[in-house]
Amino acid sequence: MKNDTAKVRTPRRSRAIFFSLFLLAAPLAGCGYNSVIERDEEVKASWAEVENQYKRRSDLVPNLVNVVKGNANFEKSTLESVVEARSKVAGVKVDSSVIDDPAKLKQFEDAQQNLSGALSRLMVVVERYPELKATDSFRDLQAQIEGTENRITVARKRFIESVAEYNKVVQVFPSSIGASMRGKSVRPTFSAPAGLDKPPEVKF
């Protein structure tokens, strides 16, 4: 008799639990809980692409340096500034917390911009060495670096946009309630210089 009673109670208890979960899920959806999760994942995905493209550029620098060093007359100071800038980029510790830490994100961006400046100066100097520009190895690097710079621009733009959407969800009611429940707050972003939507021109 007791077993029969238990069998009757079990389905009722299951239905009660399911109904309770449904009642809990409804207000969570209403306060934008799911939107917070979605925007959070978009930020993480866009940041991963930013990291990937900057790393690709950094990986190309040693090849560029080696090709340029083949020209004995090339300005050493310009070449050394590129090597030093890349070293600083490599010295910046990047982990999952960087997208939530304004200081870390700025350190990362400053190091990358420093390398961008060093590479730009290098390319200006290369204009004085037509023999170097004419080599197959240099032309191959030209194509790779141009492509990477374009992808960096696109990745940065998407990251800035995804952070903007995330911050909107975090700050605007009622989704701000869901953000608070998940312990989420406003995230830092890259500076957006004029012409960010236009890839930098890399001339060789």
Which residues are covered by each model-predicted region?
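A helix-centric hydrophobic-segment signal that preferentially recognizes long
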Residues: 2-204
